[in-house]
Amino acid sequence: MKRNSLILIGLTLGLNAFAQSNEPTDRPGRLKKDISYLASDELKGRQTGSPEEAMSANYIANEFTKAKLIPQTQTFEIIQLRMATNKCILGVSAPGMDTVVRKFVLFKDYYPISQSSNTDSVRAEWYDCGYGLVSEKLKRDDYGTVNISGKIAVIRLGYPGMEENPHSELAEVADIQTKISEVLKRGAVGIIFIKPYEKFIAPSGNLKRNEKTLNVPIFFCNQTYTFPQAPITMSSKIRVFKADAHNVYAYRNNHKKNTIVICAHHDHIGINEYENSRYTGSPEIHNGADDNASGVAAMLEMARTLKGKKYKKNNYLFVAFSGEELGLLGSKHFVQNAPTFLNNTSQKLGKINYVINIDMLGRIDTTKKVLTLNGVGTSPEFEKSIALITTDTNQLKITTTKSGLGPSDHASFYLENIPVVHFFSGQHEDYHKPSDDEALINYQGMANSLSVLEQLIVLNNKKGKLPFTKTQDAQMGRTKFKVTLGVMPDYSFNGKGMRIDGVSDGKPAQKAGLQKGDIITKLGDIDVNGVEDYMVGLGKLSPEKPTNVVIIRGAETLTIPVSFQ
């Protein structure tokens, strides 16, 4: 659902609530005013699709208006929750009869898993597919010449001998997604997974709201029941709860050919409704001061100040996205449904010169004083310009990475062949925790960083539309990770390897003994020279197969086994 209009979200936050007479006159003061509101308990963490996210959008619209811009909203629909209902059925017919003679009990005996269709039902004969393993490399095919088209596939999880040999090469083809793909290629109309042994960890019954669903019912059955040679009935009835989320944008039209997009996401993770938190305690508001009230405040500051003659070589589009924390939903929707003034006659989004994404700018470390600019490899002009930027190195040092991909909204534009730069002050221990509060923001560090942003624009003013370059790790953004290690990379680290900037409680890294400051040099079979290599290595791991991580800790090189079970 798409709707572009003057923002009317049904709230009563009038302009009088933010009277011009109370506006701070200094940049750090204006940044503090914005962050103090957006990261207040009143907004309850700005969860995408929540009333408080709408309040955030309304505040941003009001600030655009005060900057003499016309705010627009773009509303899009998100899935908040998927929940199996009591209309789900798993049952067995008597041989030769249509009547279901045994019904399994939902959540006691079975449940749908995330990949299952929301609505499909089927009644069919079943076939025992064993472990459902197919590997050309290992010369194994559990299906052989058997035709399972039109049948329900019953498949054991894992692989044979898994308890005794967790490092078997069979683990490479034993994950659930691979098994599903293999059985659907063969025409199965339903899938039932069962445990190979009692202690095997079952797949989660918590349905992922953003999982790509398939057009067949897919269940896990936790009973050691032997199905008779009779038809099985499967009916997947999953209720889907939806809500509206809000992108907000405003356009400064300087009547030029090209437009610079300056963006930030305004959503955060609420009270951890979607389990995105790194915090393991009882529910608390995650205010998201750095992530990303800081980015929104910086974007609003640019909307107020990019007015002078030296900035009029381009038009500007200021955008606050929602749904970033749920998978870049808002920016993906925006590039698919962009305002027509961004298109030229030959290319969708063709009038966009480049994109500056501001995500987590509020925690410039007072010791390191590092500002990271990600994506500078997406145009040859960026590195040339950055080399000419002047900063007091006692106040701010600039480090760069080349990749246009990453877990933030600039990636959505990069994948449309648009140059991007991501302004980032670095990871910290408060990331995705309730402790990411306004009191910890470094406002002078933010102001210094915005001076860099302004210089970047001016230095590129005479170059016209910047050429685009695809970075070498272009496929990395499409990697689907089956596991998480639970570490935060230190993006300011320029040495060989990937230095850990934080370790999440209860995750595999912590359980294995990895520590902040460790430098990962090898993950599984992949040598790690930087964050990009680490991501490639992570994408090759599966939950069923432990791996080794080689690290440098002080003067020692250690090999540490890690399990994902």
Functional labels for PLM-detected ranges:
Residues 23, 95, 109-141, 145, ...:
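Soluble metallo-hydrolase cores and metallopeptidase-like ectodomains found primarily
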Residues 26-51, 67, 72-75, 198-199, ...:
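N-terminal capping segment at the start of a domain
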Residues 33, 41-164:
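Noncatalytic luminal/extracellular "stalk/propeptide" segments of secretory-pathway proteins
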Residues 119, 255, 311, 321-422, ...:
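Metal-dependent peptidase/peptidase-like ectodomains
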Residues 297, 304, 308, 429-475:
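His/Asp/Glu-rich mid-to-C-terminal helical/loop segments that flank catalytic regions of hydrolases
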Residues 472-516:
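PDZ/PDZ-like groove recognition
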Residues 511-530:
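Conserved PDZ fold ligand-binding element
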Residues 521, 536-565:
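PDZ-domain C-terminal substructure recognizer with occasional recognition of PDZ-binding tails
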